[in-house]
Amino acid sequence: MKILFVAAEGAPFSKTGGLGDVIGALPKSLVKAGHEVAVILPYYDMVEAKFGNQIEDVLHFEVSVGWRRQYCGIKKTVLNGVTFYFIDNQYYFFRGHVYGDFDDGERFAFFQLAAIEAMERIDFIPDLLHVHDYHTAMIPFLLKEKYRWIQAYEDIETVLTIHNLEFQGQFSEGMLGDLFGVGFERYADGTLRWNNCLNWMKAGILYANRVSTVSPSYAHEIMTSQFGCNLDHILKMESGKVSGIVNGIDADLYNPQTDALLDYHFNQEDLSGKAKNKAKLQERVGLPVRADVPLVGIVSRLTRQKGFDVVVESLHHILQEDVQIVLLGTGDPAFEGAFSWFAQIYPDKLSTNITFDVKLAQEIYAACDLFLMPSRFEPCGLSQMMAMRYGTLPLVHEVGGLRDTVRAFNPIEGSGTGFSFDNLSPYWLNWTFQTALDLYRNHPDIWRNLQKQAMESDFSWDTACKSYLDLYHSLVN
């Protein structure tokens, strides 16, 4: 099968979050499964700076962006058997960042038009075209409404993956003519309109042949008013083509036996290296070096979406216990300030690190006993899977991918891979935290068994790849 991915970011070239991880990993797994895979990404200035000497020029042409004629260069490289093509236009993509400009609508309108028009020129007409989030969600619409006259594109099947429904790409309806060069009929009849705006995500949901999300629970949740971001009734209407597939993690990269960022390696049969990493981490972040105290890790953006309003409200109560917490992250200044203040009040119990440090993050995943992740909503989440890979038990709010990946501790069977609570409130966070502390202190054999179960969980991309192939084969024989 010929499969083409089109996305706004993709590791290792450009990455701001989980979308970049997916584009960096899933195509590689599909190639291993015997498929011909290509990826189209924007050619950002950070790609030029880090990988420019590994990327070759292929061709260039002009793209009509409404009344504008814009330069489009095509560049190319091959990595892990995947052919990466890059759309080059320095005006749109040399901004020092991926998102956040006032003209993001124009930037990604150009990108989508260029990606479609590039397919014939690079001689890669896919059987299946996989687009991701709102930045590329107009492509299924454009293929059927603007480019339907191109015979080579007639049989292309499309899949839209929603990584985060909160970001929908809502713009003025004038963009249809001014940028995409299409008529207003589909806006006037309500197909593309939502809240008196052109909604790119709605277009993708209606026009893609299949819609996937990054976990089965999130696929269900976005059909409810609580999580549907005002598109729940559209998703319910299209529910027959909506499904969820849990993202994977790189099992080779996140491997406690070989991880180059760790001082000591370990496995599920011998956790002595984990204990040594714990002592090393305690020393590094300025906490007393104690093997007996439960060490809780947090690696996250400090936002309300991640549940940190509830954490801050619970923190004084939690820190009354004989416990240590190490936090790494940035975000809302109010939460940054709150954690910094608590660290001054409880210097032997809380280490607050308002920064981003890849090595420290890896050490937290590997060295801690518990990993706190009480997200208000979480389409998939990767941190809880990384933590489990290293025998660090997640404590999570039961939403989205957290519900699908963390098996809550069952005290009757002594089974599970972590701890969870259903109602996001200080009471239930504290109650679940107490359950975990009691198990850690009084039932070490059960705790050790949970660690082993967590480390044996299969979150590899090979597993996720099989689910995506089932989805693809439902469209392409």
Curated annotation (Swiss-Prot):
Superkingdom of origin organism: Bacteria
Species annotation: Streptococcus pneumoniae serotype 2 (strain D39 / NCTC 7466)
Protein name: Glycogen synthase
Gene giving rise to this polypeptide: glgA
Protein family (similarity comment): Belongs to the glycosyltransferase 1 family. Bacterial/plant glycogen synthase subfamily.
Enzyme class: transferase
Keyword field: Glycogen biosynthesis, Glycosyltransferase, Transferase
Pathway the protein takes part in: Glycan biosynthesis; glycogen biosynthesis
Known role: Synthesizes alpha-1,4-glucan chains using ADP-glucose.
Binding positions (ADP-alpha-D-glucose): 15
EC number: 2.4.1.21
Record field: catalytic activity: [(1->4)-alpha-D-glucosyl](n) + ADP-alpha-D-glucose = [(1->4)-alpha-D-glucosyl](n+1) + ADP + H(+)
GO MF: alpha-1,4-glucan glucosyltransferase (ADP-glucose donor) activity; alpha-1,4-glucan glucosyltransferase (UDP-glucose donor) activity
Pfam families assigned: Glyco_transf_5 (PF08323), Glycos_transf_1 (PF00534)
Biological process according to GO: glycogen biosynthetic process
InterPro entries cross-referenced by the UniProt entry: Glyco_trans_1, GS/SS, Starch_synth_cat_dom
CDD domains: GT5_Glycogen_synthase_DULL1-like
